[in-house]
């Protein structure tokens, strides 16, 4: 391996996405098929991120690192801290997420003469480290693994002369609120397939706006779990720094309804 192959970055700006809340490359809520970092097929890319979501009655912080190997394999690690604020003052829930993603076929950017998107498979193994409250709500397990397949395609000049990115992710999961409230419940304790989608428009090479929608299972009888959505804007300052600002609508969380607020994320790449 040559020196230039390590932590190099020759990929087009913004085509690696940002850091998803669970650590994978993608949008804010949804993993995409792209591999993290700016590395190409003979390079290794590294990203680090810090994200805060401030909603009506809760605060979620997520931080982590990810490595993209030869634009083929992605390994990620994230730690989440969910502060319960008004629901249980002084209480918080920690969760660790270990992720892996493998590109199977296609290239979201290069294959413009083909209909085929980039396709990747991935997993996110989650460990909830504070299960007292989730167990009280009916959660069955403190550990779970999500499995997903993502398809991502960039259409050059695909929308009003601007580049358009579309993504669809199918996830198999038992997680309650992405695992923050444990896994499985008294209503359901089996894997369910849920759809997650993203659409983004490149207003400039360095500025992207878009929306995401994430369907989630409803395993606990005590409170309903709503689906999540966001509207985001991502500014890629350069190949090393990006900032994402979003309006996140997370629906009901535990006993608090209509939880929405601001999502802010900083990503550093090398």
Task: List each model region and its residues.
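N-terminal signal peptide c-region/cleavage motif recognized by signal peptidases
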Residues: 2-3
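Solenoidal tandem-repeat scaffolds enriched in leucines and small polar residues
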Residues: 179-184, 196-199
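Conserved short-loop catalytic and cofactor-binding motifs
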Residues: 187
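Glycine- and Gly-Pro-enriched alpha-helical subdomains that act as flexible
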Residues: 190-191
């Amino acid at each position: 391996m040559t020196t230039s192959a390590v932590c190099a970055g020759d990929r087009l700006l913004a085509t690696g996405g940002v850091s998803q809340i669970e650590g994978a490359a993608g949008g804010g809520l949804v993993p995409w098929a792209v591999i993290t970092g700016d590395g190409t097929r003979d390079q290794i890319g590294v990203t680090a991120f810090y994200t805060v979501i401030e909603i009506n009655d809760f605060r979620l912080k997520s931080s982590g690192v990810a490595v993209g190997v030869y634009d083929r394999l992605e390994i990620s690690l994230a730690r989440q801290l969910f502060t319960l604020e008004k629901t249980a003052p002084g209480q918080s829930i920690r969760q660790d997420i270990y992720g892996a993603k493998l590109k199977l076929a296609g290239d979201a950017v290069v294959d413009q003469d083909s209909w085929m998107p980039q396709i990747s498979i991935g997993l996110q193994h989650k460990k909830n480290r504070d299960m007292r409250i989730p167990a009280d709500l009916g959660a069955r397990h403190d550990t779970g693994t999500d499995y997903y397949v993502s398809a991502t395609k960039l259409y050059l000049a695909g929308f009003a002369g601007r580049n358009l990115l579309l993504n669809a992710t199918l996830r198999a999961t038992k997680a309650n609120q992405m695992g923050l409230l444990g896994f499985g419940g008294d209503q359901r304790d089996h894997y369910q397939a849920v759809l997650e989608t993203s659409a983004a428009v490149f207003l400039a090479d360095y500025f992207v706006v878009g929306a995401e929608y994430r369907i989630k299972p409803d395993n606990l009888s005590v409170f309903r779990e709503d689906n999540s959505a966001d509207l985001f804007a991502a500014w890629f300052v350069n190949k090393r720094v990006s900032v994402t600002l979003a309006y996140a609508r997370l629906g009901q969380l535990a006993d608090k309804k209509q939880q929405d607020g601001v999502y802010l994320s900083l990503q550093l790449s090398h």
